[in-house]
Amino acid sequence: MKKFLPAILWSTLYFSISNASLASLPPNNQLVEDQSTGFSVQPGFEVDLVYKVDNSKYGSWIAMAFDHKGRLVVSDQDKAGTFIIDLPPVGETLQESMIKKLPLESSWRGMLFAFDHLYMCAQNRVVRVPVSPEGEFGEMEKLFDQGPGGEHGPHSLIVTEDGKGLYLVAGNFSKNPPFEKSRIRTNWKDDVLLENYAYGHNGNGKAPGGWVLKFNPDGTERELINMGYRNPVDFALNRDGEMFVYDADMEWDIGAPWYRPTRVNHGVSGGENGWRATSKKWRKYFPDSVGSVVDIGPGCPTGVIAGTKAIFPTFYRDALYLCDWTFATLYSLHLKPQGSSYKAETRTFLTNTKGSLSLTDIDIGKDGHMYFCVGGRRQQSYLYRVRYVGSNTTVLSNLDTTSVHAQARKARHMLESYHGKENPDAVEAAWPYLKSSDHHLRYAARIALEWQN
């Protein structure tokens, strides 16, 4: 049987864990105006307009990804196409000759270079294209079909924490994911004691809602990891290898007791976040809901990226970055361990107080600068670059592997290893954690027990 720390230990330590996580962050500086763009940005950063897109030729960009040579691939939302760009150095102008159209159709929602391929998802399928060391693209291969979902369908792809597979996130219009295995018992029901208030937008929507799927690089062994989101357009892993999902609100619910603001969820194994149509939504305090690490408020989540590869100050390299399409804001998300999970604080990293800034996607270039694109729904598109020009150290912080927080996460991972299958050791290992003061340890233990007969 796997070794595990007694649950009573975590109950004893939880108070100190929670208090330790309240340590203050560095001061939240007042934003300054960027002289080039007029945007408001954190001190020490400058913003460059790299390219104002000719929409008649290149469309309105909604997805982007960097290849191993530092080239940027972007996709129009409609039929203009998919393009590859040789970005010029800082201070030089992007010429139209640097933009080339790829034979890859259009309207890709998410793109990722990994495992010597370009992976892409659209509203009805996931595909990959081989990419040679010289940067040449081969023939497109469909990995699997996924039912149509439009702007609430399959969205984004990332590499798994062990570097061996991929995750796909999708919104609540997607059909049930084509999985062969699941970390969640697939016995979800929509029965209720009292009739629900039904209205308007997706009024008949049912579980599982939005979800995260794991699969091998060749598209096989698809496994449902977590679910219950509304419309999470993007997600990312932090430096601990933990998943965080940026989920949307339902703006028609504002003012209702079942309103759930845009928020960031910890995408744990077996996680159920309880999105249901209209008044059926689970509240975050329900014991069988994972809950959020931070609630943000009204907005429209789009791109997410970890700052790890950016040449940014240490504090910002540890952050995640969240794009809000509606409110012209790029947030930095600062995670602090709390038991076996986290809590978080969001700060405005960049915004445009003088006009629109419909952020659609974001990535870190090979040069260590941050790039984001603006567009969507046939709006005028732009490509911007964010550079750090200050004097603070940009060295990565040391990973925490020994604190009570790290040990609590290790205990949760042990419990999660029993998800999705029967194991004769599971009951003895998980049962003591049902009385833990740590919600996420209790949650992981319950899911482990639900899989045992």
Regions found by a protein language model. Give the residues of each.
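Positively charged n-region of N-terminal signal peptides that target proteins for export
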Residues: 1-4
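Bacterial N-terminal signal peptides
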Residues: 6-19
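Beta-propeller domains with acidic blade repeats across secreted/periplasmic ectodomains
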Residues: 20-418
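Amphipathic alpha-helical scaffolding segments comprising HEAT/armadillo-like alpha-solenoid repeats
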Residues: 396-399, 423-432, 453
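Structural detector for internal amphipathic alpha-helices that build alpha-solenoid repeat scaffolds
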Residues: 408-422, 442-451
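Positions within the helices of HEAT/ARM-like alpha-solenoid repeats
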Residues: 426, 437-442
